[in-house]
Amino acid sequence: RAVTGEVIAYSHSNEISKNSLKNSSENLKSTLKSKKGTYNHSIPKSNIKYYEDKNPLDDKSFSSKVKILEEIDKYTRSKHPNIKQVTANFLGEHKTVEIIRSGGEIISDIRPLVRFNVSVVVEKNGKKETGVYGIGGRQSYDDYLNNENWKKVCDEAYRIASVNLNSKPAPAGEMKVVLGPGWPAILIHEAIGHGLEGDFNRKKTSAFHNLLNQRVASEGVT
């Protein structure tokens, strides 16, 4: 990100390399110098194939999906008698994306996507809890949803439900909090830090912009 006056320019890359960082910085310079609202920079071409162009919608028949779901239901319920409900579902998606840039350049992509989710309801002494887990990826059903994968999903959904069933309510209400050095500072930053940033105070959009040399926190904050 680069800032010049009221102009902010962003540049990003999907590739983590020294060259991509260098190109991004050069793009920022060109954008800030441009008088137009956007900078039309050519996209580097790549033949890297991260996933196949299979269509998961044609991958399995309805009956084969029902058979797998029945196996999933049977396997999950066999894990413990306190399991009262099992819900499993598949999601298949096939997208064809085409981007036409202002200069006439055309870029297209075929994107398959499969998703598998399991929800497990457990009950003990009248108390019910739910565990939900799922996986997904740009692959076909056959490549992704094998026995090993879906059993892991069922196991994890049941584990989460069991943890919830045996969990205790977290303490609530007002309480004293002591923050040490290091990562706890993020809590302070998210609570008030953005309002203390220079741009917001310069533009007088922050609640603190006119409170210079005045107390803005309770006496307990040191």
Regions found by a protein language model. Give the residues of each.
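Structured core elements
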Residues: R1, Y10-H12, N117-S119, K176-V178, ...
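N-terminal cap/recognition module
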Residues: R1-T31
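Short beta-strand elements
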Residues: R1-T4, S108-Q139
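Broad gene-expression machinery/nucleic-acid interaction feature
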Residues: V3, I8, Q85, S102, ...
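Generic beta-strand/beta-sheet core signal
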Residues: V3, S119-E123, V178-G180, H189, ...
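Acidic low-complexity segments
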Residues: N19-I110, D142-A185, S206-H209
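Acidic, His- and aromatic-enriched active-site or binding-groove loops in soluble protein domains
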Residues: I106-S119, G195-T205
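Conserved, structured C-terminal
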Residues: I186, A191-T222
